[in-house]
């Protein structure tokens, strides 16, 4: 395994560890109620039974297992992609995405829902609560998009021809 791959795997492990440490700490800290931090930011206690930002909420006993199964399959695909990539930016992005997805899978399988505690708001609009795993996943996908947009810059779009041939 190359150093670049260890970097991506390390990013995934770090995200999972930080996510799993932060969630119980925040659950305990927020037991007395939500905390106003700034005019645009609160710490809240919210359980999400769906995927990111409460999309695809699946209630019932099978919901967490279905969503977790999908997240695990996607994470396996992302891990294969990580092992096939040799550039730092996509490998870190993939590691962050994998760590974020698996951090939420752990919550979903152990609690039946994902604990969210970060909430931004402005002008009466409250962005759905999220957690460190969601943040890592979003940043990871953002890095993949940036890599996809700029990866070909500076390279010739036409195949090189040997000297003397046209």
Placement of each model-derived feature along the sequence:
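Alpha-helical transmembrane bundles and membrane-interface segments of multipass inner-membrane proteins
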Residues: 1-166
């Amino acid at each position: 395994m190359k150093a670049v791959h260890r970097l991506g795997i390390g990013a995934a492990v770090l995200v999972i560890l930080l996510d799993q440490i932060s969630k119980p700490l925040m659950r305990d800290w927020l037991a007395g109620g939500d905390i106003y931090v700034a005019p645009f930011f609160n710490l809240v206690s919210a359980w999400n039974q769906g995927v990111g930002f409460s999309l695809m909420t699946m209630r019932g006993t099978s919901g967490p297992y279905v969503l977790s199964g999908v997240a695990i399959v996607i994470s396996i695909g992302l891990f294969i992609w990580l092992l096939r990539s040799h550039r730092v930016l996509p490998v870190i992005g993939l590691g962050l995405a994998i760590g974020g997805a698996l951090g939420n899978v752990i919550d979903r399988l152990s609690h039946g829902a994902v604990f969210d505690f970060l909430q931004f708001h402005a002008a009466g609009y409250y962005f759905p609560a999220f957690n460190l795993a969601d943040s890592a996943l979003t940043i990871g996908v953002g890095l993949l998009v940036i890599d996809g947009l700029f990866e070909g810059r500076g390279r010739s779009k036409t195949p090189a021809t040997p000297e003397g041939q046209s």
